[in-house]
Amino acid sequence: MNELLTLTAAELGERIAARQISSEEVTQAHLDRISEVDGDIHAFLLVDHAGALDAARRIDARIADGEHLGPLAGVPLAVKDLFCTKGIATTASSQMLEGWIPPYDSTIVTRCKDAGMVILGKTNLDEFAMGSSTETSAFGPTHNPWDLERVPGGSGGGSAASLASFQAPLALGTDTGGSIRQPGAVTGTVGIKPTYGSTSRYGVIAMASSLDTPGPCARTVLDAALLHQAIAGHDAMDQTTINQPTPAVVEAARQTDVSGVRIGVVTELSGQVYDPQVEARFHEAVEMLIEAGAEVVEVSCPNFDLALPAYYLIQPAEVSSNLARYDAMRYGLRVNDDGEHSAEQVMRATRGAGLGAEAKRRIILGTYALSAGYYDAYYGSAQKVRTLIQRDFEKAWQMCDVLVSPATPTTAFRLGERTADPMAMYRSDLCTVPANMAGSPAGSFPIGLSETDGMPVGMQVMAPIMADDRIYRVGAALERLLHEKWGAPLLAKAPEVRGER
């Protein structure tokens, strides 16, 4: 494998700035890697070869002219195909957006371009980000680089798989109920869900607007922090963004000392549905943090048990509202538009043909939850539970600085294993949903491999609102401790993907 592929984003940025290497050669190396292995992985839906190389050359020219750019200038970036990209097709992995090319960039894509990052292309996801395995994509599933017969998590499996297979050093994701953290956990990469409202949703195709949170995906904690710093901040185009300074995430990622940090282990996020190997790796990681000087206590958050059922009422309710905009009248797919069918018939036929089974399931569930006679019993009750979960977090912060749990109940399951059982699929989000319900920041960090199936295991770290830096501090400590134990990053243990399929 080309050495440029294994360098961290921080290392690439430093060498590009020092003109030891060029952005063009780094970008070309990643494009070559995509051509070599993505037939096996299917992380990308679209690769912008010409656009990426052109952007890289422009960065090289600016550096040659003496401009001092940011720490990620010239570094390639994969973008989840939920972010609008001007002049580049954006599909949300759905047939409904067939042929649609956005006339503008999302705020976060704009910020990445302003920071000098080079967009390689758009990555695969579950349709409209609805799923936990990247199997509901209209364009086929993504495969886990650790085992091509297993899922890479979801919804953002494409972004995580692109990192784990060394096709990109950085990626953008979105997290509504775990769609950054869960893929990170099962692919051995780092995934961060920032505080809700600290990253702009403008230009991100909406799924559940009170939960959707864009965030960084990377192979190292520092790389995630550098990307986080580049994309976060208030945006006048998104009135839900928080007008406060971004926490010092990069400084925290460089600090690997956890002496005196109070860590709470959530008692409710364990039990029979958890793989014993996942729990074993989790408790080993907790012991390492204790040995490093952290203070660990058990914390009860009783309403976390209600988070998953409440989430799967609130999220579909918002889906049923957001997806109503796809009416075949203005853009995207249009079926039976032959002059002989009414607008209502065209709309019905288009939605029937363009939306997948999971999208339809959640629209129906959400519409039912919002319907007259059921609103208070379902949606209203779920919102009350959401408040109780927020109170659980508030009580927890009186006892500890961060909360930790396994990032997922199991390791990556086999492709097709849960597609016929929606409830089993939904349980993949058991650990991650509470943070979304509260708007709290959370991250997933690799902590080892299952001795049963050899697949990665992740630890989740949660922090108070706008205390994202605490996540990076604990994550950086974990990374250092485990690198010392293993002698190399976890991904060094991953099997080589050779592009033979």
Swiss-Prot record:
It catalyses: L-glutamyl-tRNA(Gln) + L-glutamine + ATP + H2O = L-glutaminyl-tRNA(Gln) + L-glutamate + ADP + phosphate + H(+). One of its GO terms (biological process) is translation. GO terms for cellular component: glutamyl-tRNA(Gln) amidotransferase complex. The keyword ATP-binding applies. It comes from the Bacteria. Keywords: ATP-binding, Ligase, Nucleotide-binding, Protein biosynthesis. GO terms for molecular function: ATP binding; glutaminyl-tRNA synthase (glutamine-hydrolyzing) activity. PROSITE patterns: AMIDASES. Its EC number is 6.3.5.7. Heterotrimer of A, B and C subunits. Belongs to the amidase family. GatA subfamily. HAMAP family: GatA (MF_00120). Allows the formation of correctly charged Gln-tRNA(Gln) through the transamidation of misacylated Glu-tRNA(Gln) in organisms which lack glutaminyl-tRNA synthetase. The reaction takes place in the presence of glutamine and ATP through an activated gamma-phospho-Glu-tRNA(Gln). This is Glutamyl-tRNA(Gln) amidotransferase subunit A. The lineage of its organism: Bacteria, Bacillati, Actinomycetota, Actinomycetes, Propionibacteriales.
